[in-house]
């Protein structure tokens, strides 16, 4: 056996190139779904007779669950083998995609999207951790560059691809086209994916996970209800207040835990804080435009989905 042949945590050799290919294809499919539905919003509003504030939950709910899963994944990566975790994440994503593809109503479609988000929330940070584990330090820059291209390219293609499919086929085909690729990735991963990240026995703070879910979920629901109910609505005010309270409790708990669910002390660094704020503002602008522009172009100007 060559000295350069990589081995997993059990000392068994594996093909690093094939493993990376499987990871990147799977990541492309999962990340593509983040922006795949925005162009289809007007079509889905007509299909299910729902408002814009309702249909936007297909994206905001997806991003919320995705965000909640990322810190949980840090615990999962150290607790379970990377092979089993990747197979589980892609299986969950497949179940969510099938649920969306067969959804008879909007509620089922939303549930499918949230299931998809659980899989994506695990697979994305897992990809980055695996890349750092299987490449030596001098090659990690190139490896992260490859994953960055996929993570950046997939969301950029999503709206255009969605517009073409909506104009020429059925909205269900947005999920139908992904199904065979995900199945192929699962089959390849079963044979090619290896356990490459050393395991430990970490603990997770369940209360922090609950506080963050309720806090960010309430805040997001409150803001999303403004379009229908207005800023003076007791429902809107109530959810916003609950969200702020739970987020404050969550933040206080993180600052007093020895091993926090989410490390907030990094915000002591002004450089990190500025970068985080800029990234947040940029993301808000991008996601906001991705949701509003298709509605304006299609519903107000009467243009096609592909044009929007």
Predicted region positions:
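C-terminal membrane-cytosol helix-exit motif in multi-pass small-molecule transporters
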Residues: 179-198, 213-225, 242-256
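Cytoplasmic-side transmembrane-helix entry/capping segments in multi-pass membrane proteins
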Residues: 88, 140-150, 201-211, 236, ...
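Alpha-helical transmembrane bundle and helix-membrane interface signal
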Residues: 136-137, 193-200, 223-237
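Helix-loop junctions at the membrane-solvent interface of multi-pass transporters
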Residues: 95-103, 169, 191-195, 226-230, ...
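Transmembrane-helix bundle of Major Facilitator Superfamily
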Residues: 2-191
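12-transmembrane solute porter fold
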Residues: 17-32, 37-41, 48-61, 72-74, ...
């Amino acid at each position: 056996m060559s000295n350069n042949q990589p081995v997993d945590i059990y000392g068994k050799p594996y093909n690093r190139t094939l493993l990376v290919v499987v990871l990147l294809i799977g990541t492309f499919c999962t990340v593509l779904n983040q922006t795949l539905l925005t162009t289809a919003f007007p079509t889905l509003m007509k299909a299910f007779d729902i408002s814009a504030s309702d249909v936007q939950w297909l994206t905001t709910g997806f991003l919320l669950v995705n965000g909640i899963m990322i810190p949980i994944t840090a615990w999962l990566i150290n607790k379970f083998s990377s092979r089993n975790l990747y197979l589980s994440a892609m299986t969950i994503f497949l179940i969510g995609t099938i649920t969306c593809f067969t959804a008879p109503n909007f509620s089922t479609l939303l549930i499918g999207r949230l299931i998809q988000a659980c899989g994506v929330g695990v697979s994305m940070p897992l990809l980055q951790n695996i890349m750092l584990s299987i490449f030596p330090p001098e090659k990690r820059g190139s490896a992260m560059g490859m994953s960055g291209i996929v993570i950046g390219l997939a969301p950029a293609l999503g709206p255009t691809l969605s517009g073409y499919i909506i104009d020429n086929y059925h909205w269900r085909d947005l999920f139908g086209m992904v199904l065979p690729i995900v199945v192929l990735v699962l089959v390849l991963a079963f044979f090619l994916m290896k356990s490459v990240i050393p395991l430990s026995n970490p603990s997770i703070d369940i209360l922090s996970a609950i506080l963050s879910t309720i806090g960010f979920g309430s805040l997001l629901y409150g803001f999303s209800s403004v379009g229908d109910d207005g800023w003076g609505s007791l429902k809107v005010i109530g959810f916003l207040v609950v969200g702020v309270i739970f987020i404050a409790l969550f933040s206080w708990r993180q600052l007093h835990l020895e091993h926090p669910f989410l490390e907030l002390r990094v915000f002591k660094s002004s450089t990190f804080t500025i970068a985080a704020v800029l990234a947040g503002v940029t993301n808000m602008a991008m996601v906001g435009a991705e949701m509003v522009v298709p509605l304006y172009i299609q519903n107000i100007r009467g243009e096609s989905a592909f044009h929007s």
